[in-house]
C-alpha cells in the first residue's frame, strides 16, 4: 500500500499545556485541510501536537485515539476504526469480572456516559468530536480481526440495555467539613476544587450534605499527604485510602456482584439508570 509520512505536529495545533494540551480546532482544521490530499494514504503519529512555537505537546489520556478523532472531524470522514487488544467495548473489565459481554452497538450518548463513569477503552475526548459530526466509531480487535467489534453511532437506544460494571480500585475517599460546622456552600466547594486542581486529584464521584462534602478519586500517595495538609488549613478532613469505586450502569437489581460482597459500603449513590458504591 503506497503511503506518505506526515508529522502530526505540523497539523495539530494546541495550547501550551504540555501534558494535556487543548486543541486549537480552528487552526488545526485549517492546516489539515490545507495540507492533506484525500486521494493519498498517510501515516502519522498519535498522541502529540505542537504549540504556536512549534514545541511538541501531548494530548493526554488516550491521546492516540483522540488524534484519529481530530483528523476525522477535520476531514468529515465517513467512519473511524480504532484497533485494540480487546474484542470491542466490553460491559466490564475481564480482570475483575467473569462472563463479560461485547457491547455490539451503542449510542454516542451511552458511550460518553460510560467513559465519564470510568470505562477505560474509549475516552470521552475521542467520542465528542465524532458525535458533533455524527461520524460512527468502530472498535475492533487486532488479535481477532474477524470479530465485528463494537459500533458507536447515533442510534435510538433500545429499552433493554446490557448492564455495565465499571470497577476502579485504589481510590481515595475524602470527607471535608468546615471547622465551625457551618453549611458547605458554593464558595467552599469552589475553593476545594481549586486545591484539587492544583495538587492533582482526579475526582470520580462527589456527594454533598449540609455539613460535609465527600469525593472519591485518584491521586498518588505523596500528593495525597500534600492535599490533606493543604485542605486542613481551613477544613476538617477525614480520608480513607485504598478504597474501590464500583459503578453499575443500567442496573437490573441493587445487588453487589458476589466477588465484591465482602467489602464494606462507605458511600452509595443511585439514579434512574446508575448505582455507584465506594467500597473498602
Predicted regions and their residues:
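Nucleotide/pyrophosphate-binding catalytic subdomain
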Residues: 1-119
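Fold-independent oxyanion-binding glycine-rich loops
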Residues: 7-10, 44-48, 61-63, 71-75, ...
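Flexible loop/turn segments at secondary-structure boundaries
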Residues: 13, 50-52, 89-90, 145-148, ...
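Electropositive, surface-exposed helix/loop patches at the edges of structured domains
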Residues: 36-51, 114-138, 175-189, 239-259
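Generic hydrophobic/aromatic pocket-lining and core-packing "Φ" positions
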Residues: 68-69, 127, 193
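A conserved active-site cap/scaffold subdomain adjacent to cofactor or substrate pockets
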Residues: 105-153, 158-161, 169-171
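A conserved regulatory-domain signal marking ACT and ACT-like small-molecule sensing domains
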Residues: 148-280
Amino acid at each position: 500500500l503506497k503511503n506518505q509520512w506526515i508529522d502530526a505536529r505540523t497539523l495539530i495545533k494546541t495550547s501550551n499545556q504540555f501534558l494535556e494540551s487543548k486543541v486549537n480546532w480552528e487552526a488545526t482544521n485549517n492546516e489539515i485541510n490545507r495540507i492533506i490530499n484525500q486521494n493519498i494514504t498517510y501515516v502519522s503519529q498519535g498522541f502529540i501536537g505542537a504549540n504556536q512555537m512549534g514545541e511538541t505537546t501531548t494530548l493526554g489520556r488516550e491521546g492516540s485515539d483522540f488524534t484519529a478523532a481530530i483528523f476525522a472531524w477535520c476531514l468529515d470522514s465517513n467512519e473511524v476504526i480504532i484497533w485494540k487488544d480487546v474484542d470491542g467495548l466490553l460491559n466490564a473489565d475481564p480482570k475483575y469480572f467473569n462472563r463479560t459481554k461485547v457491547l455490539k452497538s451503542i449510542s454516542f450518548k451511552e458511550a460518553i456516559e460510560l467513559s465519564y463513569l470510568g470505562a477505560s477503552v474509549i475516552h470521552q475526548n475521542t467520542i465528542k468530536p465524532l458525535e458533533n459530526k455524527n461520524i460512527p466509531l468502530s472498535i475492533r480487535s487486532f488479535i481477532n480481526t474477524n470479530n465485528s467489534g463494537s459500533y458507536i453511532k447515533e442510534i435510538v437506544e433500545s429499552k433493554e440495555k446490557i448492564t455495565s460494571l465499571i470497577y476502579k480500585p485504589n481510590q481515595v475517599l475524602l470527607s471535608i467539613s468546615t471547622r465551625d460546622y457551618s453549611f458547605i456552600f458554593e464558595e467552599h466547594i469552589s475553593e476545594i476544587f481549586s486545591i484539587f486542581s492544583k495538587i492533582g486529584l482526579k475526582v470520580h464521584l462527589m456527594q454533598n450534605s449540609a455539613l460535609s462534602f465527600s469525593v472519591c478519586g485518584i491521586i498518588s500517595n505523596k500528593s495525597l499527604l500534600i492535599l490533606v495538609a493543604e485542605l486542613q488549613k481551613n477544613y476538617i478532613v477525614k480520608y480513607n485510602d485504598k478504597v474501590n469505586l464500583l459503578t453499575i450502569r443500567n442496573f437490573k437489581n441493587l445487588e453487589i456482584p458476589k466477588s465484591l460482597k465482602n467489602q464494606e459500603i462507605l458511600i452509595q449513590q443511585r439514579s434512574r439508570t446508575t448505582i455507584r458504591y465506594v467500597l473498602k
